[in-house]
Amino acid sequence: MKNIIIIFFCMFMLMFQATAQNHADVKEIEVSGIVLDSNKDPLIGANIVVKNVPGLGVITNIDGKFKIKVELYQRLIVSYIGFESQEILIKDKKTLTVIMQESKSSVLDEVVITGTGEQKKITVTGAVSSANIAHLNVSPSGNLVNALAGNVPGVLSMQSSGAPGQNTSEFWIRGISTFGAKTSALVLVDGFERDMDDISIEDIESFQVLKDASETAIYGARGANGVVLITTKHGKPSKITISAKAETSYNTRTITPEFIDGPTYASLINEARITRNEEPVYQPDELYILKNGLDPDLLPNVDWMDEILKKGAMTYKASLNITGGSTNTRYFVSASYVEEEGMYKTDKEIEKQYNTNANARRWNYRMNADIDITKSTLLNVGISGMLKKVNDTGRGSSLVWNSLMGQTPVSIPKVYSNGYFPASEYNENYRDNPWIASTQTGYRQNWTNQIQTNVTLNQKLDFITEGLKFIGRFGYDTNNSNYINKLKAPERWKAERFRDSEGNLVFKRLNEEQKMTQSAGGSGDRHEFFEAELHYNRVFNKHHHVGSVLKYNQDSKIRTYNLGDDLKNSVPVRHQGFSGRFTYNWKYRYFVNFNFGYTGSENFAVGNQFGFFPAFSMAWNIAEEPFIQNNFKWLNMFKVRYSWGKVGNDNVSVRFPYMYTIGSFKNYQWADFGFNQSYNGLTYTSVASNGISWEIAKKHDIGLDLVLFNERFSLTVDYFNEKRTGIFMSRGSLPLTVGLYDGDKPYANVGSVINRGWDGNFSFNQNIGNVSLTIRANATYSDNEILEKDEGHKLYPYLYETGFSVSQSRGLIALGLFKDWDDIRNSPTQNTWGSVEPGDIKYKDVNGDGVINNNDRVAVGNTNRPSFVYGMGISANWKGLDASVHFQGTGKSSFFKI
């Protein structure tokens, strides 16, 4: 054994000596050079690397020059962003002059991100939309979701609030297809499920929307409502580059109701009273005093909108990006700040102590590092976070607006002349003194803190077979939110409608002062992700392009505090899935694609926990046919697409619906009439639904992609049809005789909705002299209908929601005004909501029962969600100077509430 070891040692030393001798025989030289553009200007930070030698490379200096030591007959690769790379063989020349040519980008070579990674747009067989990041960057909104409006085909959005920090739009991909628990899309940032609201636009490299089943099936149940893929910026091999940006915008109120002034209001009140044969409220001398502002305490004339609201408010945005790195280590670091000022006017004295306005501040940071561990191993490490502070008035913005809309201009002054605060005679929630509600009730603060970490390992496995690659991902996120409410109320007075003998006001105190109180709380969650993917891409005989992906994923989300004794919600929410994709194309002419997702969910009982969801797509690029290429050279791409797929949704409104829940019931009375004894016991608070399973969506998509006239004109249009069945809902048709109230009834898969529509976009590019002009537009239309819903018994067919859109608005039909008392007496009874007098609105008795009530409400208008969204823009570039304009709008929506 000893001899064997000695022999192996001697052989190793001989091999080492031979290798060292061979290496010494290779001549190493120093190569210097300069890298220039086509105008002979130096390119700073160009990359010069030795081919097939990881980590060996340099970067050009401020003069575009470089030096590097290489062996003879090695190759140098010279690259620079926006230019074509060059490969140079080193023979005996030691000084190089490299002239770089600008890369000729092509729409056909455009790369999009899909569920399985990067691929050329020409090879996409499903419905995928991309956002132009440059257009999002010029949006005045500090919120990414708001910036999407009218910029991305297939995305419908609606902003329901303008309050700072609470003004994020809701968005849906291709509209609403369910009335179940979840309608929002899956958002993935660098492959990890994240919230899109608080991402800095400055950090985004690419933004894609996956809309049909063939693109989302690989995500299983998570992709039922569409998928958004966001890729953040990464570093490039270059010297350190620092970029900073600061901007400000002035935001005005969109639509503010205009109210009449005090004298007009008083005159109309008198007119209404006289019409009803009643005494007028205001006498002529009081109208004179009111008109001339002679007694602002007893006869005020207050423009509440002007007293409470500013004309506009500022938004400030700033960002700082640092990027750079070497050939084997690259980094991107960013920080950003957004501040949205509030629209309310404030009490200057109180403002010295604390902030009562509605405003928001947000800080974002991000670090992405890419490390080439070996020639075939890439490690990506990402850390990002967000800190947000939202401030609001003590009563909250909604109650401030209720007060603004409900208070009359003549009821009370803003503040009495002696400094007393006027009390309102009405319900404080609706007709409180707006100045008190907005400035004198304390403040509310909410702090949100997010920390997101992720690691991705990309390992090429070409040593097994060419084109094989492994990708592993792990992410760990923490989210915490804390609030503090400091509330108070001032002493409030009412001035009597007379003065004392000395002419002083006589006051009556209606509300005692409430000292400031404090309440606080918080919530949080922890989210873990893991994914493992195996990719294979290969080209056979130059024409057969084959690709496949196998993916395993699991995630777990748990609330970290504020659980109390809530046992159900203390259990982590978990998902698990296995999915795959197979793709094939021949000569970029014919394409087929098959996907599947096998997903598990804890929301269903054993036997229903896993679902299989397949999808396929095909495409034909007619422009690649020889006849077209020979006779219609102006036709660059003419691709028709079709896809079909089935996807599942497990987002239900309750946890573990297949389990019974038992709770206590107190003071239950039973036995004969008049028996007053009560008992405590147990009862079902929810009944198990053992048979429930996945909400299923079957989706069809037909698409057309056109690129014409040497890529000057491009058009994409899709028609989609989706039928959602098995929607999870409570069994409304069960009668009360079964012993269950509405909140206790079991759930079942009994709902159905169909959603149809189209989306598309086009662009036109033209160079006119030194001016580069681009015209673009996009539009999305969707229309849904409820086919089945377990609503229970309705007295009249038109009261059912079935047959109408999800969230259809309903109301009474107005026929005009009551002319006189005879008109009232000869019309159906209409006193359900109060007494009726001449001049009031007359409503239609739809069911003909002689009474106007809730049974006469019918579908009116549309839903409050827009069914049609469009956007258009023009941009021009002249010698590096850019100018652009963007218009956006919505249609087929009704913004009212009855």
Protein language model annotation of sequence segments:
Residues M1-E30, E71, E84:
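Cleavable N-terminal targeting peptides that direct proteins into the secretory/outer-membrane pathway or into
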Residues A20-K27, G117-L186, F192-M196, S214-T448, ...:
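Membrane-proximal, glycine/serine-rich, low-complexity loop/turn segments characteristic
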Residues I29, V35-S38, I62, E193, ...:
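Short solvent-exposed capping/turn motifs at the termini of beta-strands
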Residues P54-K65:
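Short, acidic Ser/Thr/Gly-rich low-complexity loop/linker segments typical of extracellular
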Residues L136, S184, Y316, N368-T377, ...:
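Extracellular/periplasmic, surface-exposed regions of secreted and cell-surface proteins
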Residues D849:
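Acidic carboxylate motifs that coordinate Ca2+ or other divalent cations, activating on Asp/Glu
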